[in-house]
Regions:
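Bacterial N-terminal signal peptides that target proteins for export
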Residues: 2-12
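An extracytoplasmic/periplasmic, membrane-proximal ligand-sensing/linker region
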Residues: 32-34, 268-328
Length: 328
């Protein structure tokens, strides 16, 4: 090898090493500090639950040396959490647990932040919605409720677990519309989490609520609250006596997912790192046991597929809200 070729070859190796080192060093040392997991909901709600079971699964499956720092930002229907993430632009040390509100809120005009202002990392779970009343309520079937709503849509204020638009709200509007109820006349009251909805029902402040089962499992199992219908395609193991919307005569299936989002311009190395870590978590026995205990379905999707699903859902939500006159 000539002197010139030798020098060129050595320089090429040197440059390759220089440009490769930052990536290798970055991933080897990351995370150098605690990673905050921002729950876009208040303590006790579904998103808070997800943040805590994620942390639990990571510890039990030994996927992290340190626990997540869980931060609750439940105000504004999740908008406060998303706005906070925007302020952390480019940071690999902030992750957000959120749901389809990231698509619904911009359509309703409650936030200027859209899917472009976040980095979809993974979808984790799906669960289904219930209509729920107090254990001693006069309403025994969902048909009883719909009959009264047809007479007077304002007669039964519905409690939902977050600010509209949200899945809790859609679980009222979609079946009510399909049943011939004047949905524009419905009275829907938003509370700060499904747990709060349960408290309001038990206190007699509202007669009925629409929320996720996971947020009210203990009260349902104790018989203090009674589900009338579930939005799953088939009956759920935990609710063997509760009919689906389809069994109740309405062609409605509605899933409520939770996923992980990174900051805008999240470093690719961090994106890849968390895709790998959450994939490992989703396959762990610890996670499977936690999902079974909380009656959650594993709906894992990696970043690219998750983003594609979000874009597809965004089109559907826009069409639905437009039909209901809710676009702003």
């Amino acid at each position: 090898m000539s002197m010139m070729k030798s020098r060129t070859f050595c320089l090429t190796l040197l440059l390759a090493g220089v440009f490769a080192f930052p990536l290798q060093g970055w991933t080897a040392d990351y995370p150098k500090q605690p990673v905050e997991l921002v729950a876009a909901g208040d303590p006790g709600g579904g998103l808070d639950l997800h943040a805590r079971i994620i942390d639990m699964a990571f510890q039990q499956a030994k996927l992290a040396d340190k626990p997540f720092t869980i931060v609750n930002k439940g105000a504004g229907g999740g908008n406060v959490a998303t706005a906070y993430m925007v302020t952390q632009k480019g940071s690999p040390y902030s992750l957000q647990v959120n749901t389809n509100r990231v698509l619904l809120n911009p359509l309703n005009g409650t936030t200027k932040h859209t899917l472009k202002d976040m980095t979809p990392v993974v979808r984790l779970t799906a669960e289904y919605e219930i209509w729920v009343v107090r254990g001693d309520s006069k309403y025994k079937t969902v048909q009883d409720v719909i009959a009264d709503l047809k007479k007077d849509p304002k007669s039964l204020p519905f409690g939902i677990g977050t600010a509209p638009p949200c899945t809790d709200q859609l679980n009222v509007l979609i079946p009510a519309k399909a049943a011939g109820v004047d949905v524009k006349g419905l009275k829907i009251v938003a509370f700060r989490g499904g747990t709060d909805v349960g408290t309001q029902i038990l206190g007699g402040h509202i007669p009925i609520g629409s929320t996720s089962l996971s947020e009210l499992v203990a009260l349902v199992e104790a018989g203090r609250l009674r589900p009338l219908v579930v939005s799953s395609p088939q009956r759920m193991d935990k609710l063997p006596n509760v009919p689906t919307w389809k069994e109740s005569g309405l062609d409605v299936v509605l899933a409520h997912w939770r996923g992980i989002f990174g900051t805008p311009d999240m470093p690719k190395e961090a994106y890849d790192y968390w895709n790998k870590k959450f994939a490992q978590m989703s396959q762990s026995q610890a996670w499977k046991d936690i999902l079974a205990k909380n009656d959650l379905q594993n709906a894992f999707l990696t970043g690219d597929k998750f983003k594609a699903e979000l874009e597809k859902d965004g089109v559907l939500y826009k069409e639905l809200l437009g039909t209901l006159g809710m676009l702003k």
